[in-house]
Amino acid sequence: MSMLTITIDGKTTSVPEGSTILDAAKTLDIDIPTLCYLNLEALSINNKAASCRVCVVEVEGRRNLAPSCATPVTDNMVVKTNSLRVLNARRTVLELLLSDHPKDCLVCAKSGECELQTLAERFGIRESPYDGGEMSHYRKDISASIIRDMDKCIMCRRCETMCNTVQTCGVLSGVNRGFTAVVAPAFEMNLADTVCTNCGQCVAVCPTGALVEHEYIWEVVEALANPDKVVIVQTAPAVRAALGEDLGVAPGTSVTGKMAAALRRLGFDHVFDTDFAADLTIMEEGSEFLDRLGKHLAGDTNVKLPILTSCCPGWVKFFEHQFPDMLDVPSTAKSPQQMFGAIAKTYYADLLGIPREKLVVVSVMPCLAKKYECARPEFSVNGNPDVDIVITTRELAKLVKRMNIDFAGLPDEDFDAPLGASTGAAPIFGVTGGVIEAALRTAYELATGETLKKVDFEDVRGMDGVKKAKVKVGDNELVIGVAHGLGNARELLKPCGAGETFHAIEVMACPGGCIGGGGQPYHHGDVELLKKRTQVLYAEDAGKPLRKSHENPYIIELYEKFLGKPLSERSHQLLHTHYFKRQRL
């Protein structure tokens, strides 16, 4: 590939042909502001609408200013990024964006994380000289997971890229013109009435408060203050890999112990770990896989393979809408969150000697779809949900700050027994490929009766959107598929329909898996941040004395005292579910 020379603000560098001015500026550590631009190249995600014009620069020999995010470098190009003309243009663009933008920064959920707010501060904009007819054109759209406030939409089109190109859901598109132009569902439908999967990737990339999570922080505070309730909490694997980012701890640092300590200081009666339920999920899902595989190898043509993982609620809703003819293919095992809730409201409530109605189960999740999942009616008993409240990693960070807890100064503490113990197979649920890797560790030993010497399955790891691997289990060679991002899942299922053989497929809706979930601290397009989170979970796995789910002594005890065995009648009643054919609107 030929290299091109470019000079930016007096600094010269060489970049590959096809690079943009913005790409070249990054190699020189020159910060050109952007709003609509988003590039997660390692995940094959990019939004280069070049519509906001905040990134304009002056190119020698050209009359007009050029958007640096979409202008390719030419050889010997000379660029100025901070000339008076450029600065005035950027200020004008920002002033126009603010002309009809709500001025409610003090109470906006995105305050402090809003990229428009940050740029207004950076360029010293204290008032807007333009009157854009500031008024409310749209009602708020509030679903269980997401709140849309389209008066704050700046038409960056990032959410549209994530929804249509990355997730292939097709819910969002540009509508209307002028001051009323926004990105929204067709016919002004509510998100809850569309094929939206609640994955929250639109929220993860929105630069303003137009798309935010539906917060339930106050509901948690009220529950903790209720003397008539026993309030317990579970924390998902990916939370510990990212929580510290919002609480003054360096990215890539595991904060498992500090998180447990903080939750106790918030007032939770018992602090548990969703990792326990991840081990339980492997026992059920792995046993279901071996059962199906055995019947398939024996010639039973009624058995459906590949088995599809069912841990991700965004993925579950996606296949309910998009693949209604495949509802008998996914595992019937509930997600770890819902397994935990079912066990907590039965087994653990019995241990405490209280009715399930007295127990409040709070989940801390990296995922917005978990808010939707816990409200699905099949996950409740007589109107009492297995999981009562779900908050995100971001919401927990806000709660810790609100309660004046010095998070960085907390000592490390352990989770409570019995629902806080886990093996190394559990934390890797938070990364793409982790669920299938954990399942393979257990499936191998249950199927062969032999000890698995090498527990790391490197072929299913990594940030590739689609991965395929062949794994030897006894005399059988299993073909495994892994996808993260719903568009990649759609692509992976195509060869299945065309007759290509897979025995098991793992799907996670979010880029990188749960570490890139819609409820995690905002990554602002930094793929390296996602990689650091991944490393935290693999390190936690490697540091555990037990690394296979079936070795968890508390899981063994749970089966001996309560469930009987995997796939037993009680296990099916509490730990398995069914799926629904949903309309495609």
Curated annotation (Swiss-Prot):
Domain (4Fe-4S ferredoxin-type) ranges: 144-174, 185-216
GO MF assignments: 2 iron, 2 sulfur cluster binding; 4 iron, 4 sulfur cluster binding; ferredoxin hydrogenase activity; hydrogen dehydrogenase (NADP+) activity; iron ion binding
Family annotation (InterPro entries): 2Fe-2S_ferredoxin-like_sf (IPR036010), 2Fe-2S_ferredoxin-type (IPR001041), 4Fe4S_Fe-S-bd (IPR017896), 4Fe4S_Fe_S_CS (IPR017900), Cytosolic_Fe-S_CAF (IPR050340), Fe_hydrogenase (IPR009016), Fe_hydrogenase_lsu_C (IPR004108), Fe_hydrogenase_ssu (IPR003149)
Domain 2Fe-2S ferredoxin-type: 2-85
Record-linked SMART domains: Fe_hyd_SSU, NADH-G_4Fe-4S_3
Cross-referenced SUPFAM superfamilies: 2Fe-2S ferredoxin-like (SSF54292), 4Fe-4S ferredoxins (SSF54862), Fe-only hydrogenase (SSF53920)
Pfam families: Fe_hyd_lg_C, Fe_hyd_SSU, Fer2_4, Fer4, NADH-G_4Fe-4S_3
EC code(s) of this entry: 1.12.1.3
PROSITE patterns tied to this protein: 2FE2S_FER_2 (PS51085), 4FE4S_FER_1 (PS00198), 4FE4S_FER_2 (PS51379), 4FE4S_HC3 (PS51839)
Gene3D superfamilies: 3.10.20.740, 3.30.70.20, 3.40.50.1780, Fe-only Hydrogenase (Larger Subunit), Chain L, domain 3, Iron hydrogenase, small subunit
Name of the protein described by the UniProt record: NADP-reducing hydrogenase subunit HndD
